Each structure stands twice: as structure tokens, then as C-alpha cells.
Amino acid sequence: MSAKEKFASLSPAEFFKRNPELAGFPNPARALYQTVRELIENSLDATDVHGILPNIKITIDLIDESRQIYKVNVVDNGIGIPPQEVPNAFGRVLYSSKYVNRQTRGMYGLGVKAAVLYSQMHQDKPIEIETSPVNSKRLYTFKLKIDINKNEPIIVERGSVENNTGFHGTSVAISIPGDWPKAKSRIYEYIKRTYIITPYAEFIFKDPEGNVTYYPRLTNKIPKPPQEVKPHPYGVDREEIKIMINNLKRDYTIKEFLMSEFQSIGDTTADKILELVGLRPNKKVKNLTEEEITRLVETFKKYEDFRSPSADSLSVIGEDLIELGLKKIFNPDFTASITRKPKAYQGHPFIVEAGIAFGGSIPVGEEPIVLRYANKIPLIYDEKSDVIWKVVEELDWKRYGIESDQYQMVVMVHLCSTKIPYKSAGKESIAEVEDIEKEIKNALMEVARKLKLYLSEKRKEQEAKKKLLAYLKYVPEVSRSLAIFLASGNKELVPKYQGEIVEGLFKLISKKLDLINIEEYRKVYKVDSE
């Protein structure tokens, strides 16, 4: 007879401590990268979302060479964190300010806490936080750990000092085992790609080797921040409606509930919905049965006349900033970008943006350089499993003037949504949702058409140059004949006139063709005044 089974529950902290790879911490190299990423994303959400031009300083120091322990410190000038929220914000898994119906870089209330858990598994130093909210006269300091069994913060140390400098923002330092040589290229690439789409930010990065990289602010223009909106009927399920009902502050009728708590439902639409469900408009919403809630959700899914979800909850990068970032980093000959109109999937609004850069200083490769972004987060790992890569790979680039397998091109795609369909909690690749895939393809085709037009005009220009340059071989004969005609028999004037005619013709051709060194062409065609 088999032994009796033992049953037990796990706290969220214990679950992710046992399964760190699910949160993007499978090994020291990835853990170091993921820690940097999570802290930078928190800093950006604390700045640009609130209309603050980001100043972000990232430092990685090797503090224990024998054990390869690194200290990652990120400092921002954001809104800061209320001191009463700091312990839970950093010490309770699945506790977050990002459980709202608007676009955020974070989603799960997991990121930085996963770094703390990984840190605790391998060394004993607590996470260190310094923060001062906007207009606060105090600077608050904390040292924290996580009680893994209880999923609660352990406050190792806390204090506050007078804030005499007017500083507002947050500094977070985490000591973590890492592999800098293996993580180095990914971390540098992540910061560079973040800068491409946030050219309004300033980044200073000091790596463990002592190298300092400065990314200057290129503009003071910040994209419109996302606004929190009510849920769309298409995007809710039974349990979400039950939670909404339980959280109501007053005793609504079902019609009042529909009109006040959802977007896209006005008086007429509410009446139509309730008629389809078979509910009286004046029935108290808290008296709904389980079966009635089920019918309501099913009606939501089938109803075809809802307005599309509001895009106010989204924040795009914008075409100007996309091209500004691409030009700064890649120095191309050509850039184009597009911000598509809002669409929706499963009741969640989304917008696709695309950019393309061609030629110039872009290195030639067998594949284009693909920059993937989701809610303004660069996606560095798992590239080939992402829907963006799938669309780029399947697009017939030859139709758009790319005639060889040697690409000198950067392709950028940004997806923003209130719900990004990531393949895992590590947030590195986007799933193949049909509506999203279609929009990505449409966006890329649109910028590809702009590239095709540019390449077509460039080829026509080159052909025109060839034809005009072909006429150079006639310059000596034509200039001499004109000089003889103008000299009217005075042979001494012929060289003078011929020289003036040659110079005039070459100035005209040089201006017409925008040639920098016309002398090289004079040597080729042996055109000199006599």
C-alpha cells in the first residue's frame, strides 16, 4: 500500500523561488541582465509616465570576485515611492501599482521581487532602497528581504534623513550573482535599444570594468502618457465582473452598473444588452445569480455593436521620436516610420508602430537588424520565437527594392497594449495573436513602401548621373569650339575662353549632381583648359 499523500500550499514567493526561470532568472548571466532591465523599467515608469524627463544612472560593480557577486544600482529622478508602500513594493510578490487598465511597462508585480528572491538564494545582503517622493522634505532609506514562506517583507533596517537638496526619485541597489562577460553584450544592447525609443531620456551607465557610457537627451518632447480607463465589455470574464461588483461603493442597479463601470456602454446599449440577457434594468447588481452573470458575459462576447476600446490607455512613441532615435544610433541614409490607428483584440486596445532605417553606417548582414519592443520595453532574448520576427522573416523584401540577401537595414516594431500577450512571465517574446500579427504586417508593409519609393528615386538619380557624366567626354571638344567662336579669330583668347567655359560647365554639372569632388571626374575624362 502506498504512503499517504501529503498536501501543502506554496506562497507566490516560494513558487518563484523554486521556479526562477519562469521570471527570467535561469542562470547568473540572464539574472544580471534581468535585474538591470527590471530596475530601468521601474525608473522609466516613475518618470516619463508622469511627465518627468528621465535622468537615469546605472552602475554595476563587482563586489565579491571569488563568488562573482555584482551590485546593481539604478537611480532615477522620478516621483518616488510613498514610504509606507516601500516594504510591500519590494518585498511582497504580486504586489504592484501596475494592476490598472492602462499601458505599463510592468505587468505582474513580479520583476524586481524576482531579483530579490534570486539574490536571497545566493547571498545574504538585503536590497537597499532610498526614495523621496516629489515635494517631500525627507529621504527615506530601507534595507529589505522577503519572508518566502509568508510572502511578506522583512524590514532589516529603515530610517530617514532631511532632504536638503530637493531631490525626488528612487535609488535601488541589489546584490546578485552574475556573469558579466556573458551578460555584457545583452546589457549594453538593452540600454542602447531603450535609448532609441526614449531619446528624451538621459542615461549614464558605468559597467564593472569602469567604462562609462553617456547617452545624452536629444529632445524634451515626451509622448502623451497613458490614462487609466474602464474595462471594455469584450475583455472581461465572470470572475472579473464578480470582483467589480464586490468592490462597488454604492448599491447600483444592473443598468447603472453597466453604464458607470464599463466603456462603450451608454443608455441605449445598456438597454439592448439587458434585453438580450433577459434582465430587468432596475435589478440590483449585487443580487445577480451566478447563471445571470454567465449569461451577461456570453452576451458581451456575442454583441457586435460595441465601439472599439478607447486608446486613451495607451502611449505610443510617435513617428518623430522613432526616427530621431534611429538616426542617432545608426546614422542611416534613410528612415521612415508609422504609427497605426488603434485596434483591439479580446477587448484590449493595441497600437502597432514601425520604423525602418537603411544604408549609411548600418552594417551589412544576411538578415536585417530587428528591434522588438512591447510597451516601450526592448525585447532582447528569444528573438526567433516572437511574432514580430515571424512577420519580418515572411515579408517579401524584394518587392520593396531589397534585391539581394545582403541587408543594410534596421527594422523596428513597437506593440503597445493594456495586455501584451507575452509567451512567459520573462516578457521576452510576443505570442502569435492573429489580429496583432496582421497589424504588424500592415505597419511593416507601410514603411517598406516608403523605402521602396526612396530606393526607386535613388536609382533614377544614379541613372541620371551616369547619363550626365557620359557627356563629360564631349566637354573638351565643345568648349574648344565655343572658345574659337567667341575669340573671333583671335587665337590668343581661345585658351582663356576655353578655360572659362570648362569651369562654367563643371560648376553647373557639379551643382546639378551634387558632386563633392568634381576634380576626380575631370581627371577621368581628361578635361582641362589649354
Swiss-Prot record:
Going by the UniProt record, its keywords in alphabetical order are: ATP-binding, DNA-binding, Isomerase, Nucleotide-binding, Topoisomerase
| NCBIfam families associated with the record | PRK04184.1, top6b
Q: What are the coiled-coil residue ranges? A: none
Q: What taxonomic classification does the UniProt entry list for its organism?
A: Archaea, Thermoproteota, Thermoprotei, Sulfolobales, Sulfolobaceae
Give me the Gene Ontology terms describing cellular component: cytosol; small ribosomal subunit
**Residues reported to bind ATP:** 42, 76, 97-98, 106-113, 427
| Keyword check for ATP-binding | yes
Annotated function:
Relaxes both positive and negative superturns and exhibits a strong decatenase activity.
Q: What protein am I looking at?
A: Type 2 DNA topoisomerase 6 subunit B
